[in-house]
Amino acid sequence: MKNKHKAIAAAGIAAAAAGVIGYRVEAARRARADADTLRQAYESLNGQERLTDPGNYFQAVALPADIQVRLLTAQQAANMSEGTVFFGFPTCPWCRNALPLALEAAAGAGCTLCYCPLDEYRDVYALEDDALVEKTPAGPGYHALLARLGDCLEPYTLTDSRGNAVPIGEKRIFAPTIARFHNGALTNFWTLEAIGFQLPEGQSKYAPWSGERRGMVRETFQKMF
């Protein structure tokens, strides 16, 4: 009987160990897949002309092979209780400059950076003959995300043909934005505007940032992480 009990206990321990190993293997697989997806999204545009802005080309970026990143949906980001989320998209020239620095800072702090592809969820409005038209509806979870980020966000407005501001009636998540959550609370909210970032006069937003401006942004990221 004792041997039988020992055998059952051993089998239970083995099953639990196998479950833990399986979970870790699957987590590692997902992490690699997320890193590959993000890297492909950004690097596939290297040197390409932006079709919606002819004459301007996406700068080449190279994301490290060993980046620690987790892709989130808008709803997952809205439900975040612990971690740091980068909101951006590959065709955003500001994101192409900022994301490598954010990944670098996260790696230096031993953290995994979460990434939410903002262009897949953010709604888009336009003015046609000064009439407000919804061009792209909000994706699942986007309005929950607006509610979660709350007072940190600026109103979403457009400008009509007479130069008047036209409010959309909701807030706007601009790219890039970084939000840090701790113990269920939003503890840090980062945008380029908030840190006083400006390009030198005449520099294209598509161009790589100077060492001075990279250093400025890197320092804010290091403090955040």
Language-model features, listed with the residues they occupy:
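Extracellular/periplasmic catalytic domains that process cell-envelope and extracellular macromolecules
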Residues: 77-79, 107, 170-174
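The canonical Cys-X-X-Cys-His
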Residues: 92-96, 178
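Typically the conserved alpha-helix immediately C-terminal to a functionally engaged Cys/Sec
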Residues: 95-109
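Short active-site neighborhood of thiol/selenol oxidoreductases, capturing the structured segment around
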Residues: 78-92, 102
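Non-catalytic, surface beta->alpha helical segment in thiol-disulfide oxidoreductase systems
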Residues: 167-225
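N-terminal leader/targeting and pre-domain segments
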Residues: 7, 12-80, 200-225
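Loop/turn elements at helix/coil->beta-strand transitions in domains of secreted/extracellular proteins
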Residues: 80-83, 109-114, 182
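Thiol-based oxidoreductase modules, predominantly thioredoxin-like and allied folds used
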Residues: 87, 110-161
